[in-house]
Amino acid sequence: MNFIEAALLIQGSACVYSKKVEYLYSLVYQALDFISGKRRAKQLSLVQEDGSNRAVNSGTPCETEDEFLSLDDFPDSRANVDLKNDQASSELLIIPLLPMALVAPDEVEKSSNPLYSCQGEVLASRKDFRMNTCTPDPRGSFMLDPVGMCPVEPVDVHPMPRSQKDAEEAEEQPMAVSRNGSPVSVRSISQEPDGPALSSGDEDAEDVAELPEVALEPAEPRTSQQTAILPRRYMLRERQGAPEPASQPQETPDPWQSLDPFDSLDSKLFQKGKPYSVPPGVEEAPGQKRKRKGATKLQDFHQWYLDAYAEHPDGRRARRKGPSFADMEVLYWKHVKEQLETLQKLRRRKMTERWLPGAKQDLWPAEEERLEEPLEDLGVADDFLEAEEYVEESEGVMPREAAGLDAEAIPESLKYEELVRRNVELFIATSQKFIQETELSQRIRDWEDTIQPLLQEQEQHVPFDIHTYGDQLVSRFPQLNEWCPFAELVAGQPAFEVCRSMLASLQLANDYTVEITQQPGLEAAVDTMSLRLLTHQRAHMRFQTYAAPSMAQP
């Protein structure tokens, strides 16, 4: 890369960025000047206002300048109402439902009241042209009627007609007389949207005092109708009584709510329980001597089951396989399995004592403890499985050699070790059928069969010594400085010997003992390597006899 061009490029980019920084710097200063100028203009306007006020006070005329109205100089008006979500109606809550004016009528309602044209054609339904009815809100806005009734009107038990209600409100509305003699309606206290709904008697007195003075002057002679209406004009509308606070429903405690461990519970009165007398066999008298009780023997499940569930008058059950209750299935088969194992051990012991009379008696201590139990519980009088069935099953489980043992087949000099060895071999032979060979185990076995011969062959090879193989390769050269193909030097040798000779030749070339070259025609033949012997002296031998010049004696 040309460094001059690179330097010019860097200089140009630096100039561009410096101009950008200067432009941003000027923008910042312009913004600061604009802010300071606006502040100075505001100060000048304040000074001019002070000067104009002084001029007015002094009586000197000053020129009036046209000023624009600000956007927020409108007076507060009752027509503008800000609705807030947290302001709720004090009388009734508006149900947040879809207004009835926006609910589409059904097809049945449309067909029941159709709208016909002059020619008798059905144009539409009268239900399609429904007026949106609105209800004035206490805050001054108009709300759509959600359920067809005014949400701010109190719910009366006997609603009166609309016309009658309007008439009464017109009568209760106070009137006042203006300067020109025309009646003017005076707003009542209840019409104030922001004022409280209830007030005290002092406020009523103040409202009466605030009435115009014209109404307090002596009235002129009027007709009987006017005199009847006149006293009603000064009456204020009766205020409704304070509504009784609705009794809040008692909250029922949640039984699933977790209790507070640190909360103090209500104290409950102690209730005396019902006493029970202790049986004399259980009660311990203070003067009696306590005797150590032995361990109680558990009742035999088999005998208990027969006593509890036997349903025969003579006390014997029919031959049935398994209990009659599903709950006893597990216990039943567990008991049967234990009996079967005990009978098998008993039969095996009898056979051993028959052929080995001199065997030791303490070979099966656990079995002797089990055999101490009565034989009636082991299957002699068993109602579930008879003794003959145990014998048949045990004969099927015993090995075939042991089942067919006779006096002629087994010699008298048969020892216990020989019998155990035969049983173990028989067990191994019979357990082979339970071995399941998977696909992965088959692949592993094939790989082992393939790799085992190779490993054995590698173990038979002599250790690899690179100097020994180098000496053998040098000895095969006919003379110095003569090119010989590598294939001729290793002709007739196995593959692993060729690999070792190849590695030894590379070491010789590194020591400058031989020279390696390649003949043209690599694409035609793979073996194009040739070697030439340079010297018979080996490098490692030279290093052994090497002496540095500094070590030589002068």
Curated annotation (Swiss-Prot):
Gene Ontology MF terms in the entry: chromatin binding
Cellular component annotations (GO), alphabetically ordered: chromosome; condensed chromosome; condensed nuclear chromosome; condensin complex; nucleus
Biological process (GO), any one: T cell differentiation in thymus
Superkingdom of source: Eukaryota
Protein keywords: DNA condensation, Nucleus, Phosphoprotein
UniProt-annotated location(s): Nucleus
Biased composition (Polar residues): 179-191
Biased composition (Acidic residues): 201-210
Keyword hit for Nucleus: yes
Its biological purpose: Regulatory subunit of the condensin-2 complex, a complex that seems to provide chromosomes with an additional level of organization and rigidity and in establishing mitotic chromosome architecture. May promote the resolution of double-strand DNA catenanes (intertwines) between sister chromatids. Condensin-mediated compaction likely increases tension in catenated sister chromatids, providing directionality for type II topoisomerase-mediated strand exchanges toward chromatid decatenation. Required for decatenation of chromatin bridges at anaphase.
Subunit structure: Component of the condensin-2 complex, which contains the SMC2 and SMC4 heterodimer, and three non SMC subunits, NCAPG2, NCAPH2 and NCAPD3 that probably regulate the complex.
Entry similarity comment: Belongs to the CND2 H2 (condensin-2 subunit 2) family.
The protein's name in its UniProt record: Condensin-2 complex subunit H2
